Amino acid sequence: MIRIATWNMKQAVAPKKPLPELWKWIESEIDPDVIVLTEARVPKDGLPDGWNGIWTPGGIGPRRTWGTIIAAREIELEEAKFKRNPKRIKEYIHPHPATLHTADILIDGDTWATIVGAYGFMPDSKNGWDAALGIVNECVDLLDSGNERVILAGDFNLWPKDILPVVENNLELVDIMGLVDDLPELKGAVGGSRIWTHKNGNSPNAARQELDFIFTTEELADEVVAVAGGIDDFPNAWDVSDHAPVIVDFK
């Protein structure tokens, strides 16, 4: 079994815990084999023992020293190489490459799947639409290369009602939370949210939002054995971040 996860570490504004504590929390509470971390930083001395990863040193820039990290334990990651559409790249060059990374997940030297770690960066707006085109273009090129084992994960800063049609219509990827039968209604939710992954403020009446997602190709969706996520599954997540993780286990 292999566990894939995504979690926002909350390093952009007012971090709640020191980095070493956050990495220990990842190991003890999420226990992933591979994880996409958004709004994330690597400790000053590098990744903790046993981890390897792909990220942009220094993050987005001097004022934003955080970004997206794809990290793994006991599994090798390799930056993915695939044929890109030159017309599409000319049409859209991602302005913040630190927020978007792509890696091959290697098991016993073979590529098990390719994972895209994405963050819906919001430099000039209140949601992730600014980044959505770049994320979709990255995945379109990857899927056009013939890869049938692709995972897209991260914090998109978009509600389900906005991001699901974009991903499903343009990429034909499967929303792993949609594989869960009989999800209970999330009271106080906005934007079609089904699980509470982002705490929008400290008010008891703050909107309950789902901003963190994992999508897969159909071939990988057939191998899913368990899905979990949100504050109900990670009840102490608010102690360390304003986001709760999402995880999926594959056979």
Question: Residue locations for each model-derived region?
Answer:
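Active-site beta-strand/loop signature of hydrolases that rely on acidic residues for catalysis
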Residues: 2-9, 23-45, 115, 138-164, ...
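Short hydrophobic/aromatic beta-strand or adjacent loop that forms the aromatic wall/cage
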Residues: 6, 64-69, 95-102, 208-214, ...
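Acidic/histidine-rich helix-loop elements
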Residues: 6-18, 124-128
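Short, solvent-exposed loop/turn segments at secondary-structure junctions
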Residues: 10-12, 41-43, 76-77, 120-123, ...
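Structured beta-strand-rich core segments of catalytic domains in phosphoester-bond hydrolases
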Residues: 34-120
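Short Gly/Pro-enriched turn/cap motifs at secondary-structure boundaries
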Residues: 58-62, 91-93, 152, 202-206, ...
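Metal-dependent phosphoester-hydrolase catalytic domains
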Residues: 81, 145-147, 158-251
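Active-site-proximal segments of metal-dependent phosphoesterases and phosphodiesterases across multiple
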Residues: 120-135, 160-172
